[in-house]
């Protein structure tokens, strides 16, 4: 039998019968999802007039920091939510995709406004008809430009979506990457319509 000079925690009274209620039990997935949804760091990709509405959301009247998104980053390496706000042209599409590729995993995308979602009123040869042609979009915000309340609703929708993910199980299973995260080629040539 091995003896040590260390006291037994049960004999010293450090852990008693009342200690059971003082612990929080959770799964690893729930803990990771809670951390992710309460610390979303957006990166606004302001391409036109919708970017002004995003500035209004960050002000004190709407208080984006209530949702853990007060740290607006303009560096893709420090952000995990890209908010594409405005018209995406074919020339700008390659730059948007490069910035998306520089963001670390996990990352999410919000298409803000009618122009980012569907091309909006600009149905022409030079405008990409929806940013979902080059990026996997998680949440769409309608409107031209959308109201600040709609942007807050999109963040809440993204937070609900994060509750359903299983990051620890995906990590330990070593699954293949999802099709939505696969690289999407960008056609930089003008369409022949």
UniProtKB/Swiss-Prot annotation:
Binds 1 [4Fe-4S] cluster. InterPro entries: NADH_UbQ_OxRdtase-like_20kDa, NADH_UQ_OxRdtase_20Kd_su. Keywords: 4Fe-4S, Cell inner membrane, Cell membrane, Iron, Iron-sulfur, Membrane, Metal-binding, NAD, Quinone, Translocase, Transport, Ubiquinone. The keyword Cell inner membrane applies. It is found in: Cell inner membrane. It is a peripheral membrane protein. GO terms for biological process: aerobic respiration; electron transport coupled proton transport. Residues 172-193 are annotated as: Disordered. One of its GO terms (cellular component) is respiratory chain complex I. It catalyses: a quinone + NADH + 5 H(+)(in) = a quinol + NAD(+) + 4 H(+)(out). Its cofactor is [4Fe-4S] cluster. Its EC number is 7.1.1.-. Its main location: membrane. The keyword Cell membrane applies. Belongs to the complex I 20 kDa subunit family. NDH-1 shuttles electrons from NADH, via FMN and iron-sulfur (Fe-S) centers, to quinones in the respiratory chain. The immediate electron acceptor for the enzyme in this species is believed to be ubiquinone. Couples the redox reaction to proton translocation (for every two electrons transferred, four hydrogen ions are translocated across the cytoplasmic membrane), and thus conserves the redox energy in a proton gradient. This is NADH-quinone oxidoreductase subunit B. It comes from Akkermansia muciniphila (strain ATCC BAA-835 / DSM 22959 / JCM 33894 / BCRC 81048 / CCUG 64013 / CIP 107961 / Muc). The lineage of its organism: Bacteria, Pseudomonadati, Verrucomicrobiota, Verrucomicrobiia, Verrucomicrobiales.
């Amino acid at each position: 039998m091995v003896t040590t000079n260390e006291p037994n925690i049960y004999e010293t009274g450090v852990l008693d019968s009342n200690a059971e209620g003082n612990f929080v039990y959770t799964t690893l997935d729930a803990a990771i999802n809670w951390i992710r949804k309460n610390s979303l760091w957006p990166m606004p990709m302001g391409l036109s007039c919708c970017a002004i509405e995003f500035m209004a959301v960050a002000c004190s009247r709407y208080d984006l920091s209530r949702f853990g998104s007060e740290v607006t980053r303009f560096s893709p390496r420090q952000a995990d939510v890209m908010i594409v706000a405005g018209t995406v042209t074919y020339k700008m599409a390659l730059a948007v995709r490069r910035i998306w590729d520089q963001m670390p995993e996990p990352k999410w995308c919000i298409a803000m406004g009618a122009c980012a979602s569907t091309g909006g009123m600009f149905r022409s040869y030079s405008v990409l008809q929806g940013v979902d042609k080059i990026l996997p979009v998680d949440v769409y915000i309608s409107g031209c430009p959308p109201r600040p309340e709609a942007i807050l609703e999109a963040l809440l929708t993204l937070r609900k979506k994060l509750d359903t993910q299983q990051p620890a199980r995906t990590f330990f299973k070593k699954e293949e990457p999802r099709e939505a995260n696969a690289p999407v080629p960008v056609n930089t040539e003008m369409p022949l319509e």
